[in-house]
A protein has these predicted regions:
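Second-shell residues forming the walls of enzyme active-site clefts
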Residues: 47, 94-109, 119-121, 186-352, ...
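Hydrophobic faces of well-ordered beta-strands that scaffold small-molecule active sites
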Residues: 53-60, 82-86, 109-115, 163-166, ...
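Short, gly/Ser/Thr-rich active-site loops of penicillin-recognizing serine hydrolases
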Residues: 353-358, 362-370, 374, 447-453, ...
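Short, conserved catalytic-motif segment at the N-terminal edge
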Residues: 586-647, 668-670, 830, 837, ...
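Short active-site loop at a secondary-structure junction
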Residues: 595, 606-613, 634-695, 757-771, ...
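Short, surface-exposed loop or secondary-structure junction motifs
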Residues: 687-922
């Protein structure tokens, strides 16, 4: 008795602080319906026993089959329970079940779910958003509000009305076995702010909420699912810390509070769990803190409350303590009987039961159950996973990324040409999404280790480490709670701890507390936290490293003595491609994807192309990156994003042209100079004296092309002995095919043919590729450097464009290279691994007319550099003025629509005969390629389009792609999606 008096006195002292805040308390909005006509009518229809039934919420599963459904229906019909709490299953079945249950219920059921991080916590085929600890790192609480509104939308669309969230516990115990990553962190103010944002987002979207686990479960070493935890903190500490977020939430209009199963002597000296404590539920929560909303017990089947309490009796005591809803009672019949008996003997007043039932019914009316309609399930999964819902997840992940170290601002990576990068993913023996995304930016050598490592692997890795100057280490620890032993073997742990951290960027994909268990990790060149391991976190973390994303998250908890809460560095803004969803750049996913997919499938089904790659970017954000179809019509191998295509004449703007612009910036080249200024061989020819500005805009009067290859053949079709041999030799070193080797001096014949070719006196637009055979030599003459070495060093290596290359079979296997034509005239074989253009082939595969191979992604990097007026990856390649000059129409008065090297839209749009989509701006520029390729950039909309195909397989005579206008129609879809 004395103990009880002392406890009450202490609570009064606590009230001294709490009562002052009561003026700020905002009553839950649903309480306005407590005495509504609908609530009155329902109350009149209920017997005393049925009213008690309204306090009961029963567990329901949509994956347990028909017997479970029958059991739930029987419980609903027999006891008129107040609600259901849904757990594992799938959304469509859940909706069907809930509709069925509602149909059988006398009183509409309140549907609840424990979906702290979204429906994915319970249901398959739905989105799991970041854990609250990850959200705790986010600096913009508007995003927390947004997740609240989105989670509310999804939950309501599955027929439910109440979410047991947010978790308002302040997690200040790294070994907490049950809350931990479910908390917003250890700072009570931030926990309160984020809890309120999450709560308001849900409530403003029409969903009931429940803050938990009152009065605070953040500092326990015991999981209340298995045992009753005890919290021995003082009343002052509890009031100042654990209770703070709950008080703020109550003041902000919180709907509901979930009471935890805790033993807290400072609040109740008895050994009762807090759920059964009147001192905590009634005196503290209701009377002292002024909370008038729904009070819900934590699950009444948890051992923290059942170990020392019998079914039925424990439920009665929970009601006596002041709870409104008994969540997951063990035995509904016993619970109702015990409560009914307590009412009869006046240990529970009927008026108290009625008040609680009115409160529950008021919540139901607020949720719309007074006008119940079945929940539709048509297109439900698609609706739950719509583009905006997916984008929000990505936004939350990016905003949560926390960089704890970043020596020398190593992240984002700069100067890719100076880096030799390897990645090691630990905890996953297969290539991870993290590694796949790293590979989008540069050539990264990947290694994977499971949870253990053997000596042979250690030796192999040590050799690789010595040969690389940067290690990207991804740690995928499967242990969710740091109290558990880290999932790696001691041998592997020692290997990690012995890594040369001074050249290692570490990304930790799990609970941040666990970092404390890895020695020396604080010495990493850079240390990045993602808080959990998923494909999305892996993807965006990799983008962060290369500058496709940025970080400004702050650590929400302290990690031992290594890093304190609030730590976190801000990295530079985006400097390279961001791979994301269309909505992130203001495009409509459905319009974009369905429109392009359908056009590509039309092209494939009409045999215009066997397959393709398409990449679309807006504002430097890659919003579509897809591979379609097969390598050829006869080869069913699927096209991958890593496959490389012969880009044909797109080479014209991808090799020598950027080199010339670069040299112009260095005052080593000018478009006003002539061929003979750089190649004296052409002095005195009909090509002398013609400025490059005219030549590169195709109005110099040059012949369109020269069939150089025909000079290698006799009249009977055999090769002239001095031109081509079946085997290579010192005299015949130039590979055409595996059994065709060209004379080393044939390049001179090509130059001679160009020199002697006619030049028209009429200076009008006439497409010619002749000069592009000369440009590599001109670059070499100016720079005294091998042409390929020059463009690699000054462009491709810096861009990370690792597949943008000449002679791809020198770097890649044939399985990675897409074939082109089955050539019956010259090469008498399928062209695979060498350039399709005969002239380029006779130049050793190296020409500015054709010859380059690439995948869409690497080619897009060069094109994005153009679109960004000469910069990419925080480096300037070409000056803005030079790029503007080259991408502008030079001779419009001469009816010439071309830029310098670049193609431009026709001066007058010609409908289906135009070279671009109708909505492409006059500022746009690009090029097409004979093999079925196209790149196009539009500065007005900041849009980039890359299309790669091999329409020339099996023959160049296949012109269906042109007839279908597939490329320009796809381009128009982009503009339609922007609209």
């Amino acid at each position: 008795m004395k103990t009880k008096i002392v406890t009450t006195f202490l609570l009064i002292l606590l009230l001294g602080i709490a009562v002052k805040g009561q003026e700020k308390v905002t009553s839950p909005e649903f309480l306005k319906y407590t005495n509504s006509k609908w609530v009155d009518s329902v109350m009149k229809s209920l017997t005393p026993k049925e009213r008690i039934g309204q306090l009961m919420f029963v567990a329901a599963y949509s994956n347990k089959g028909i017997e479970h459904e029958k059991e739930i229906l029987e419980t609903i019909q027999k006891w008129n329970i107040g609600g259901l709490v849904f757990f594992q299953g799938d959304p469509v079945t859940q909706v069907k079940q809930m509709n069925s249950y509602q149909k059988q219920a006398k009183t509409p059921l309140l549907g609840a779910i424990d979906a702290e991080w979204g429906l994915g916590m319970r249901l398959d085929s739905t989105i799991s958003y970041p854990y609250q600890m990850a959200l705790g790192a986010i600096q913009n609480n508007n995003l927390i509000y947004k997740i609240g509104t989105e989670v509310a939308r999804q939950i309501k669309n599955t027929g439910l009305h109440l979410n047991f969230a947010p978790v308002a516990d302040v997690n200040n115990n790294p070994d907490n076995p049950v809350i931990n990553y479910r908390s917003f962190g250890e700072d009570k103010y931030k926990v309160a702010q984020k809890s309120i944002a999450y709560m308001q987002g849900m409530q403003n979207a029409g969903l009931l909420t429940t803050a938990k686990h009152f009065p605070g479960h953040g500092d326990t070493n015991t999981d209340s699912h298995y045992k009753l935890p005890q919290i021995n903190h003082s009343l002052e500490r509890l009031n100042n810390l654990e209770l703070y977020p709950f008080k703020e939430l109550i003041n902000a209009g919180l709907n509901g509070v979930m009471v935890a199963h805790l033993n807290i002597p400072a609040l109740d000296a008895s050994e009762k769990p807090s759920t059964l404590s009147k001192a905590i539920v009634t005196d503290l929560l209701q009377n002292k803190l002024g909370f008038s909303g729904l009070i819900i017990t934590d699950a009444m089947r948890m051992k923290g409350v059942t170990n020392n309490n019998k079914p039925g009796i424990v439920d009665k005591e929970a009601v006596q303590a002041g709870n409104d809803v008994l969540e997951l009672t063990q035995n509904v019949a016993k619970a109702i009987t015990e409560i009914e008996n307590a009412v009869k003997n006046n240990s529970i007043l009927q008026a108290d039961i009625d008040n609680r039932v009115r409160k529950i019914l008021a919540a139901k009316q607020w949720a719309g159950l007074h006008n119940y309609k079945p929940t539709p399930n048509k297109n439900l999964v698609h609706n739950l996973n719509n583009a905006n819902a997916k984008l929000l997840k990505r936004q939350l992940v990016e905003a949560s990324l926390t960089v704890l170290k970043n020596d020398d601002d190593v992240v984002p990576l700069q100067k890719l040409d100076t880096l030799n990068i390897m990645s090691i993913s630990i905890g996953d023996s297969l290539t991870t999404k993290f590694q796949e995304t790293l590979g989008l930016y540069d050539n990264v050598k990947h290694f994977n280790i499971g949870n253990d490592i053997n000596p042979a692997t250690i030796d192999k890795l040590k050799k690789a480490i010595n040969n690389h100057n940067l290690i990207l280490l991804g740690i995928h620890d499967s242990s969710a709670f740091p109290k558990n032993k880290i999932s790696f073997s001691n041998t592997l742990l020692k290997f990690i701890e012995g890594l040369p951290f001074n050249k290692t960027v570490v990304t930790y994909f799990k609970n941040p507390y666990s970092i404390a268990k890895i020695k020396n990790i604080e010495n990493a060149k850079s240390l990045i936290l993602t808080y959990q391991d998923s494909k999305t976190t892996q993807d965006i973390a990799a983008q962060l490293i290369f500058g496709g994303a940025s970080a400004n998250g702050k650590l929400p908890v302290s990690i031992g003595s290594k890093f304190k809460a609030g730590a976190g560095l801000t990295t530079a803004k985006k400097i390279r491609f961001k791979y994301t969803l269309p909505e992130d750049a203001g495009l409509n996913s459905k319009t974009l994807n369905s429109g392009i997919d359908s056009l590509i499938q039309q092209a494939i089904s009409n045999k215009a192309i066997p397959g393709a790659q398409v990449l679309i970017a807006k504002n430097g954000k890659v919003v579509l990156h897809k591979a379609y179809g097969t390598h050829t019509y006869s080869d069913t191998t699927k096209v991958k994003l890593s496959n490389v295509y012969d880009i044909a004449s797109v080479t014209k703007i991808s090799s020598a042209l950027p080199a010339l612009m670069h040299l112009q910036d260095a005052n080593k080249f000018s478009t006003e100079k002539t061929i003979d200024d750089y190649l004296p061989y052409f002095k005195g020819s009909n090509k002398a004296g013609i400025p490059f500005r005219e030549i590169l805009t195709h109005q110099a009067g040059f012949s369109p092309w020269i069939p150089y290859w025909q000079n290698t053949l006799r009249k009977n079709g055999s090769y002239k002995w001095h031109t081509i041999k079946r085997d290579s030799s010192a005299r015949f070193p130039i590979k055409i095919t595996s059994n065709m080797w060209l004379n080393r001096n044939y390049k001179k014949k090509v130059f001679k043919a160009i020199k002697k070719s006619p030049v028209s006196d009429v200076k009008k637009y006439k497409y010619s590729g002749l000069v592009f055979y000369l440009l590599p030599t001109i670059v070499e003459e100016i720079t005294s450097t091998n042409f390929v070495d020059y463009i690699n060093a000054n462009f491709y290596d810096k861009l990370g464009a690792t597949t943008l290359t000449y002679n791809p079979e020198q770097k890649f296997s044939h399985s990675k290279i897409i074939p082109t034509e089955n050539d019956f005239l010259f090469r008498h074989s399928t062209i695979h691994g060498t350039v399709h253009d005969e002239g380029a082939a006779m130049m050793g595969g190296i020409s500015a007319n054709a010859g380059l191979f690439s995948n869409a992604n690497d080619l897009a990097k060069l094109m994005q550099m153009y679109l960004d007026m000469g910069t990419y990856g925080n480096e300037e390649f070409i000056s803005k003025n030079t790029l503007k000059q080259y991408t502008s129409v030079q001779f419009p008065d001469n009816n010439n629509h071309r830029g310098i090297g670049f193609d431009k839209p026709y001066l007058i749009y010609k409908g289906e005969n135009s070279n671009t989509a109708k909505d492409a701006s006059k500022e746009s520029f690009g090029h097409t390629g004979f093999t079925g390729t196209m790149v196009w950039m539009d500065p007005k909309e900041n849009v980039l389009f890359v299309f790669l195909s091999n329409r020339v397989t099996p023959t160049r005579e296949n012109r269906i792609l042109y007839k279908l206008n597939t490329r320009t129609k796809i381009q128009q879809v982009i503009y339609d999606a922007i609209k």
